[in-house]
């Protein structure tokens, strides 16, 4: 979904700037941490935190990719009347929700001792709305500092690419159909990222190894959907795409 109220340069932070957003404390992933994480058993718990835009989300995922638990708070009702995500309102909603979302996620996974049961905390550091990203990063820093577990910075778009390596049954989605449900993408593969901010075709050769084959020269498709829905006075709180294909909807004249 597109943002409202401030310019992209003020709101968005790319992964190249992640050192700036991560520079105010916390136990961050070092080379020793990387080696330790690689040697973890397949059933080791990783806590993931996501606050890049207008959803506050957390999940416990095993090293093998099994989703043990997840919790999410949507902000659709907050942004509906504005026709897009308002960064300041999104940040405030994240601040209100983040503690309860993480607590719910840990409870569902029966985690009672983070320091003993969770091996790392992964958190989105960009791209996204900088003021929203900081809410998630600071929560991750707090957990890391209190329990002595490393932080793994996550690139938002890289995560979208690599979800193709998670088995379909883990997605828990009725809107996605896959021909071979028990297969996952094997390196190398081609990934198409289509969202409100990005349209990119990539060759994925491994984790951290990507080649851009092509990308949009202007607006992303998701942004075009949002703008069109807004012009048609359709609700865009959940995105312009879902708002459109409804034959029962009466369009304004």
Model feature map: region roles:
Residues 2-45, 51-52, 59, 69-70, ...:
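A short helix-loop
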Residues 28, 40-117, 123-127, 134:
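N-terminal beta-alpha supersecondary unit
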Residues 54, 157, 197:
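A generic "binding-loop/recognition-motif" signal
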Residues 72-76, 156-158, 216-218:
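Short, acidic/turn-prone active-site loops that include or flank metal/cofactor-
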Residues 95, 99-103, 137-144, 162, ...:
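Predominant activation on well-ordered alpha-helical scaffold segments within soluble catalytic domains
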Residues 117-175:
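Glycine-rich phosphate-binding loop and adjoining helix at the ATP-binding site
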